Amino acid sequence: MKFLFDLFPIILFFVAFKIWGIFTATAVAIVATLVQIAWVAFRHRKVDPMLWVSLGVVTVFGGATLVLHNDTFIKWKPTVLYWAFSVALIVSQLAFNKNLIEAMMGKQITLPHAIWGKLNVVWGVFFVLLGLVNLFVAYNYTTDQWVNFKLFGATGCLVVFIVGQSLWLSKYMKEE
């Protein structure tokens, strides 16, 4: 259910794009992200920092798209967000010796310390690559194809990556 809730702004963006076009869809994405944060704050009293980052990025890049009437900015938004995730993962590990993946998932699964480190780096690299793929699609395909990729392609890549990670991690997980 959380996965679908996380996709809420993307799904609304997709639907709005198909009905009204990129500029209305961009405005819808900004509002949907605000609503998502308001709901999380109301329900849990705490909003994940990455949701705030997402709101900032969609507001800045979406706002630039609307003000300048240029869809290039909204096409850069996923890449900037993916790269922000990557930087957060890698810098937190290298500069602060804090593994964010372990901090998020450490209570759910038990893994050797070295595997947590590898997992953190692999996720960081994945987000860099996903950002590059987004730019490739944004600059080499139509806006309609990019929107389809944003919902189905990027989400599909994420699901496949998570399944692959689960299979890889299963051999390291301790029996409880």
UniProtKB/Swiss-Prot annotation:
Q: What keywords are annotated for this sequence in UniProt?
A: Cell inner membrane, Cell membrane, Membrane, Transmembrane, Transmembrane helix
Write down the InterPro entries for this protein, in alphabetical order.
YciB
Give the transmembrane region(s).
24-44, 49-69, 76-96, 119-139, 149-169
Q: Where in the cell is it found?
A: Cell inner membrane
What does the entry list under GO cellular component? Answer: plasma membrane
Pfam families assigned: IspA
User: What domain of life?
Assistant: Bacteria
Q: How does it sit in the membrane?
A: Multi-pass membrane protein
Has keyword Cell membrane? yes
Q: What is its main location?
A: membrane
Function comment? Plays a role in cell envelope biogenesis, maintenance of cell envelope integrity and membrane homeostasis.
Q: Which family does it belong to?
A: Belongs to the YciB family.
Q: What is this protein called?
A: Inner membrane-spanning protein YciB
Organism in which the protein naturally occurs: Paraburkholderia xenovorans (strain LB400)
Taxonomy, top ranks, is:
Bacteria, Pseudomonadati, Pseudomonadota, Betaproteobacteria, Burkholderiales
